[in-house]
From Swiss-Prot:
This is Protein sey1. Residues 50-300 form the GB1/RHD3-type G domain. GO terms for biological process: endoplasmic reticulum membrane fusion. The gene is sey1. Gene3D superfamilies: P-loop containing nucleotide triphosphate hydrolases. The keyword Transmembrane applies. Residues 764-766 are lumenal. Pfam families: RHD3_GTPase, Sey1_3HB. HAMAP family: Sey1.
Length: 858
């Protein structure tokens, strides 16, 4: 007996291809299914064939030459029985691929199953395996070859009529489970040892009569009582000569028979009931079980599991389970390739999100489109062969998984483009504004914003279009584009507000500078009481009475000028009327704050007291023509002092309250500032200081807002001013009294009498006279040039330097000469006896010691 060499039996885990060279054991004699069937199909390159494969099973009694027939027909190497023995050879079910196919004469990928023979003594009465193997073969095979000898035709047991009856019953069982599909199969009777004495037609007729009887004998479900065997089975017949007696003819006929195993088409003109049977290709489309090759192993295992556990065989359910299993496998495989393509982008996007730095990923759109197309195409190619309902459901699941991740990437890309676009837009506008400011030629803010908005939208749409996945329902960015445009508008408005704030700040600084200068000049003018001869006798000049009028007019004119500047510049920002109104309202409030701060600065106690004193001194020390007064005892010092003091004192109540001379009331600040614009926001108001009489919540009236000095301050300021004025008056009084001390006239007569000789000597001597004349001219020129002060200082400095130099030389002389050293020694010995002696080095120019000088300073 030849054994199944290079066949993979049950329990073999070898991955060596040589183990599967001749085939694989599908089911062993113990009803165990071989899970390595997939490996064999992979090694034989059947797995990727899809539906392009065919499965044949052979039935027959034990030791009737089934394996021999298959080996000659398909070039397989199934074990055959030795001619010297009569025993079981094939145990279980074995499978091998056709080795004779050349791609032309036979169909591709023919798989042949050698089923254990029936009626064997090894199993005896146990027919359970026969029934289960028949059911398995019928559920999986397109063609069932029934191998019988010619002399067995007409017998019941010898012709395997019992097994065929089982096949018919099983087929009806399968039909009841799936009434939508007619499971049609071909029963191919190969009559062995055919000698031709009985014509093949007669044998066909006998067998068909037996088939009809068997069919009629089985119990049928309601509705199928009138059905015939031809409704579910097709039949073909072929006779083969005796292998031992006619070996050459046997080989020749098997070659002819092998040519029948190709794809064919049903011939509708043949009537099987009249004994007309096809002699063409045996593989008709309706025979195929429509199980893809890559799922056959799983399907066969599921079928056998139900059969071996005596469960009702439900092929539709098994097909759905197979489709579920294979579609899940294919989906996982497809997702692995999808992950490889997409995960790097997901990782980059996730990292950028964690870092808070949005990044537009280059090449994302192409990768997404390619990954999605490949995933759906690969899944469709592999899974579309399976159960349509399961396939469509799993395809939807795949698309859902793929689209969920791609949608997240798409949204992330749009978000990154959104955020980076907003940042770039803001930076670009800021940079353009700064560039315009540096050039100093001015810039059109609205034009800058419009240009940058166009660039930002164009860039965003480029990114979005590049990321779009055609056919994906989520791949529409119009809503995101609208949100992007909206935020660009909001950012533009914010940048415009910021720019207007900066403009307002610049205008406010300009107002502050102008008001600081002009109002400062008005306050400085208060320090001068000189007005020329036109000054009235009372000293109350109109200019002082209208001081606040001038300040208010200056303030209003300055702010109006600033408002014109602000309005002209804001027009280039494309600002709305509401924004301009808010800006002008803020400018007026800020300007009032600037004026009030300047007034408070000028009205500090020290500054105001100084201005009052200067005002008083100008009125007191200068006459009506502005000429300085030289006080004489005959002058009315008290009257002038009183008038100047009272005139200056009138400034204190004048300055204490901001009132207009024309109306004797505070300026209309509330009307001038105006009401808060309706478009003003909280942010517009939060940095504005409250104004009394304008802001109700401030709780201050306009009168209180215009009060510069309180009563206590006025009283204190009046007292201090009077004290300062009294000091000036006392000084003037002393000056007038000091002028009364004069040299007696007789002194000049005595001086003339006693110095007459010297005067005559000088006048008579030309040299003396000329020297006197030169000295007089020099003294006059020095006086006119006001050089007596510098000359005296230079003289004093020269004398001090001469004194220091003299002391130094004297010290050197005393230290270097013998006499000097003796004198120093004597001075040192006597210093303890006299505390009044001093070192010369400690004498100053007045001859005092430094100690005496320190006492004088105290």
């Amino acid at each position: 007996m030849a054994t199944n060499g290079h066949f993979a039996p049950i329990g073999s885990d070898s991955s060596d291809k040589t183990t599967y060279e001749h085939g694989v054991q599908v089911i062993d004699e113990n009803k165990e299914f071989n899970t390595n069937l997939t490996k064999y199909l992979t090694f034989e390159n059947v797995t990727p064939a899809g539906f392009n494969y065919h499965l044949i099973s052979v039935f027959g009694s034990q030791s009737t030459g089934k394996s021999t027939l298959l080996n000659h027909l398909f070039g397989t190497h199934f074990s055959v029985m030795a001619e010297t023995e009569r025993r079981q050879t094939t145990k279980g079910i074995w499978l091998s691929k056709n080795k004779n196919g050349d791609g032309k004469s036979m169909a591709d990928n023919i798989l042949v199953m050698d089923v254990e023979g029936t009626d064997g003594r090894e199993r005896g009465e146990d027919q359970d395996f026969e029934r289960k193997s028949a059911l398995f073969a019928l559920a999986t095979s397109e063609v069932l070859i029934v191998n019988i000898w010619e002399h067995q035709v007409g017998l019941y047991q010898g012709a395997n009529m019992g097994l065929l009856k089982t096949v018919f019953e099983v087929n009806l069982q399968l039909f009841l489970k799936d009434k939508n599909t007619t499971h049609r199969s071909l029963l191919f009777f190969v009559i062995r040892d055919f000698v031709g004495t009985t014509p093949l037609k007669a044998l066909q007729k006998t067998l068909m009569e037996d088939m009809s009887r068997l069919w009629d004998s089985i119990s049928k479900p309601p509705g199928l009582e009138r059905s015939t065997v031809h409704d579910y089975f097709d039949f073909q017949f072929y006779g083969l000569p005796h292998k031992s007696y006619q070996p050459e003819k046997f080989v020749e006929e098997t070659k002819k028979l092998s040519l029948r195993f190709r794809e064919g088409q049903k011939n509708a003109t043949l009537n099987a009931q009249n004994g007309e049977f096809s002699e063409g290709g045996v593989f008709l489309p309706e025979y195929h079980r429509r199980i893809p090759a890559d799922g056959f192993s799983v399907y066969a295992e599921g079928i056998w599991d139900q059969i071996v556990n005596n469960k009702d065989l439900d092929l539709p359910t098994q097909q759905e389970l197979l489709a579920q299993f294979r579609c899940d496998e294919i989906l996982r495989e497809v997702m692995v390739a999808f992950d490889e393509a997409i995960f790097p982008f997901e990782d980059k996007q996730s990292q950028a999100s964690r870092l808070g730095e949005p990044e537009v990923l280059g090449g994302l759109g192409a990768a997404m489109r390619s990954a999605r197309a490949k995933a759906t195409k690969n899944f469709e190619t592999e899974a579309s062969r399976y159960h349509k309902g399961v396939y469509q459901r799993k395809r939807a699941e795949l698309e859902g998984k793929v689209d969920t991740r791609l949608k997240a990437l798409f949204q992330g890309q749009l978000n990154a483009a959104h955020k980076s676009g907003i940042n770039d837009f803001s930076d670009a506008v800021t940079a353009e504004v700064k560039a315009g400011q540096k050039k100093g030629t001015g810039y059109d803010f609205a034009e800058i914003v419009n240009d940058e908005v166009k660039k930002a939208l164009q860039k965003y749409e480029e990114v979005a279009r590049a990321t779009v996945v055609e056919g994906a329902p989520w791949s529409n960015y119009q809503q995101e584009l609208a949100l992007y445009e909206k935020e660009l508008s909001e950012v533009s408005a914010r940048l415009r507000r910021d720019e207007m704030r900066r403009l307002a700040t610049r205008v406010e600084r300009w107002v502050q500078s102008r008001l600081g200068e002009s109002v400062g000049l008005e306050f400085n003018a208060l320090g001068s009481g000189r007005a020329g001869g036109a000054a009235p006798e009372s000293g109350e000049k109109p200019s002082e009475k209208k001081f606040w009028d001038r300040v208010w007019n200056l303030f209003v004119e300055t702010v109006l000028d600033a408002e014109r500047r602000f309005t002209d510049r804001a027009s280039s920002f494309d600002a709305s009327l509401e924004e301009v109104d808010v800006g002008l309202w803020r400018l007026r409030r800020k300007s009032w704050g600037v004026l009030r701060a300047k007034i408070e600065e000028e009205m500090t106690e020290g500054n105001l007291l100084l201005k009052l004193r200067e005002n008083f001194e100008d009125k007191f020390r200068y006459d009506e023509a502005g000429v300085p007064r030289i006080w004489r005892p005959t002058d009315d010092i008290e009257g002038i002092y009183t008038r100047a003091r009272e005139s200056t004192l009138t400034l204190i109540p004048l300055l204490s309250r901001f009132r207009l001379a024309e109306t004797s009331a505070p300026p209309p600040l509330d009307r001038w500032v105006g009401h808060t614009p309706s478009s003003a926001t909280t942010a517009d108001e939060e940095d504005l200081p409250p104004i009394g009489g304008v802001d109700e919540e401030e709780g201050k009236s306009l009168e209180e807002e215009m009060t510069i000095l309180g009563d206590a301050k006025r009283q204190e300021l009046t007292i201090r001013f009077k004290k300062a004025a009294d000091g000036v008056y006392v000084e003037a009084k002393r000056s007038a009294i000091g002028g009364m001390t004069q040299v007696p006239l007789y002194f000049y007569g005595i001086l003339l009498a006693l110095g007459w000789n010297e005067i005559v000597a000088v006048l008579r001597n030309p040299a003396y006279f000329f020297l006197l004349f030169v000295c007089a001219v020099g003294a006059y020129v020095t006086y006119q040039l006001n050089l007596w002060g510098p000359i005296l200082k230079m003289t004093e400095a020269a004398s001090n330097q001469a004194m220091i130099e003299g002391k130094r030389r004297l010290r050197e002389f005393l230290e270097t000469s013998d006499t000097g050293r003796q004198a120093i020694a004597m001075s040192s010995s006597g210093s303890s006896r006299s505390g009044n002696e001093h070192e010369m080095s400690r004498l100053n120019k007045q001859g005092k010691s430094s100690t005496d000088e320190d006492v004088d300073d105290l």
